[in-house]
C-alpha cells in the first residue's frame, strides 16, 4: 500500500465490523491494495461471496486540500451517473456509510472488477490503437453527461466555466500558501492565468469530466489475446466543465481521437483547445506540487522526488504557454 499521512490503518477487527455493517458476515482476509495516495483501500476475501473492495476516506478533520473535501461523495455520485447514462462498466457499490458511526471516516464497499488496470500491461499494449479507440468512445460517453453548472459538485456549482476554473486555481494556490509550499514562478502562474482565462469562455456546456484517466484507473481484459477496454474507476476528482481535463494524456493519440469523434463529439485540436488543455495541465501540476504537504513526510525521499517532479511540470507548462504567446 502506498504510504500517505491521509490514509487510515484500521485493524482487521475494525475492517470485519465494517464488512458486517455492509451485510458481509463471512469476510476472511484483508489485503491492503496498492492503490492511490489519498484513500485507504483493502481487498476483502470472503468464504462464499467472492472478493470485494473496501475504500475509506481520510479521517474526519484530517488536513487535506480544499478540493479534496468530501471527494468520496463525488465518486459515488459519478458512479451513479456513469452507470445510468452510459454503457461504461463501473464497480457496483454494495454499501456506503457516511455517518461516522463505524469508523471516523466516509467509506464504501464495492465489487472487484474483472480484468486489471492498464498500468499493469506492457507499454505496447497500452498504445494499442483498438484500445485507444475504445477509450476515446468511452470518454465521449462521459462527456455526454451534462450538469446544471460548472465546477466541483462539493463546492456548489458556478454559472460559467471561467468562474469555476478561477475558483479552482485560487483555492489550490491558497492551499499552497497555507501549507508553506512555495510554488515556483508563482507570479508568472498568476499572470498566465489572467492572460489566458478568456480562452475558457468557449466552454458553454458543463459536461462530466473524470479528470484522472490515468492507466491505473482504466481496466482492461484479455480476449483472444487482445486487450479490450473493460471499465473505469476512481472518478473522485470529477468536475463539471471543460472536457479538456480528460485530454491531458491523449493529445498525441490519434486512435483516441478517432474513437472520441466517432461517438459524436466533433472536436478540432486547435489553438483554443490546446490552451485550455494547458490550463488544465497547469492546474493539475499545482495540485501535485501542493498535495505532498498533506500526504508525505516532509523532506522524505518520496516528498522531495514528487516536489521536484511537480515543480518541473509547472515550469514546463509555463514554457509551453510562452511559446503559444509568441
What are the roles of these predicted feature ranges?
Residues 53-56, 92-95, 154, 208-211, ...:
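Short beta-strand segments
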Residues 8, 65-72, 125-132, 182, ...:
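Flexible, glycine- and charge-enriched loops at secondary-structure boundaries
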Residues 2-5, 288-326:
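ATP/Mg2+ or Mg2+-diphosphate-binding catalytic cores
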Amino acid at each position: 500500500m502506498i504510504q500517505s499521512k491521509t490514509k487510515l490503518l484500521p485493524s482487521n477487527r475494525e475492517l470485519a465490523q465494517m464488512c458486517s455493517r455492509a451485510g458481509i458476515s463471512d469476510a476472511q482476509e484483508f489485503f491492503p491494495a496498492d492503490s492511490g495516495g489519498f484513500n485507504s483501500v483493502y481487498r476483502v476475501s470472503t468464504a462464499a461471496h467472492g472478493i470485494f473492495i473496501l475504500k475509506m476516506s481520510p479521517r474526519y478533520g484530517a488536513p487535506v486540500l480544499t478540493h479534496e473535501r468530501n471527494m468520496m461523495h463525488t465518486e459515488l455520485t459519478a458512479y451513479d451517473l456513469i452507470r445510468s447514462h452510459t454503457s461504461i462498466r463501473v464497480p457496483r457499490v454494495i454499501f456506503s456509510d457516511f455517518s461516522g458511526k463505524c469508523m471516523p471516516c466516509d467509506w464504501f464497499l464495492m465489487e472487484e472488477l474483472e480484468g486489471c488496470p492498464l498500468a499493469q500491461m506492457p507499454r505496447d499494449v497500452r498504445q494499442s490503437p483498438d484500445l485507444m479507440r475504445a477509450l476515446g468512445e468511452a470518454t465521449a460517453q462521459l462527456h455526454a453527461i451534462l450538469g446544471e453548472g460548472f465546477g466541483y459538485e462539493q463546492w456548489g456549482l458556478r454559472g460559467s466555466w471561467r468562474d469555476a476554473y478561477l475558483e479552482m486555481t485560487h483555492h489550490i494556490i491558497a492551499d499552497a500558501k497555507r501549507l508553506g509550499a512555495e510554488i515556483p514562478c508563482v507570479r508568472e502562474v498568476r499572470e498566465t492565468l489572467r492572460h489566458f482565462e478568456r480562452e475558457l469562455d468557449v466552454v458553454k456546456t458543463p459536461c462530466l469530466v473524470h479528470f484522472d484517466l490515468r492507466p491505473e484507473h482504466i481496466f482492461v481484459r484479455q480476449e483472444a489475446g487482445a486487450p479490450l477496454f473493460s471499465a473505469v474507476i476512481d472518478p473522485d476528482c470529477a468536475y463539471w466543465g471543460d472536457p479538456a481535463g480528460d485530454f491531458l494524456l491523449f493529445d498525441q493519440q490519434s486512435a483516441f481521437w478517432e474513437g472520441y469523434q466517432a461517438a459524436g463529439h466533433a472536436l478540432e485540436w486547435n489553438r483554443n483547445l490546446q490552451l485550455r488543455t494547458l490550463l488544465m495541465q497547469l492546474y493539475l501540476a499545482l495540485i501535485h506540487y501542493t498535495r505532498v504537504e498533506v500526504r508525505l513526510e516532509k523532506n522524505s525521499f518520496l516528498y522531495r522526488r514528487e516536489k521536484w517532479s511537480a515543480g518541473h511540470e509547472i515550469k514546463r507548462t509555463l514554457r509551453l504557454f510562452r511559446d503559444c504567446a509568441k
